Amino acid sequence: MKNLITTILLGCAVSVQAQTSTAHDIFSDTRIITSQSVETNWKGEGTFIISHRFGDIYQNDAYSILYNFLGFDGGANMRIGLDYGITDRLMIGGGRSGYNKTYDAFAKWNIMRQQSGDKNLPVAITLYSDISFISDTTNAVLDSFFVDRFSYAYQLMIARKFNEKLSVQIMPTLIHRNLVATKAESNDVFALGAAVKYNLTPVLAISAEYFYNLPGQLPAGFNDYSALGIDIKTKGHVFQIQLTNSPFLIPEYYIGATQGNIIDQDASGQFDLNLRLGFNITRDFQLGGRQY
């Protein structure tokens, strides 16, 4: 009788566990292209990240594409960063970008995971916030008040994995700059971002992201950020190759300071192409916590 009761209880436990399924790997990494994804590091997991954006591929004419070797000879921007999982749902990170010699720090908290079955949660939700600091000393305007060097970003990420191939995320975002260059710019910028990932194979995916800035917040010449990427996933590494209209690597800049649509016109009305090659390389490592 004892054995029978034990068997029944174990069977019920397995049955209940099997009735709830959590969606994993909604996106390939904690970044989609430049923007953050709902994914967070596991507890004790660290990630070293190098992000690089080259110069404009197209400069004045088609000849410049090869002359500047697809933008490799142009001005580039790079960010080196380090992330760490405090818990399985909370991660922190920081880095430095070459543009304005900017330092940034962020926190990201996954408050809900997508689940199906006995406990049905149709989406995953993650909160994100960061702070950035301009350390460049060549801009005399920033010398007036120390706090003028700070900017902030706040983001709500809502994502759904529809099947093993398709994932979608939306990102309502607010950025705040303590100092802006002109009166035509708003200190606060509201934007709505959207991203999609489609798995071609278990290790290869294509992704795209776009941020729409609400009208009346930025002066003429500033545009919405967009990007298209390819993700190559291996054990412990994710290599991402991108095409984007922005050289920037943190939301305060790629949302609030991107200039030029991908297909555009220059000041003289001639055809212009604002497109840059870029890449992200990530390396995961274990410092403690979860054992694999």
Regions of interest found by a model, annotated:
Residues 1-23:
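Bacterial Sec-dependent N-terminal signal peptides
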Residues 141-146, 180-183:
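Flexible, glycine/proline-enriched loop segments at strand-loop-helix junctions
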Residues 165-166, 170-212:
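A mid-sequence, solvent-exposed acidic-amphipathic segment
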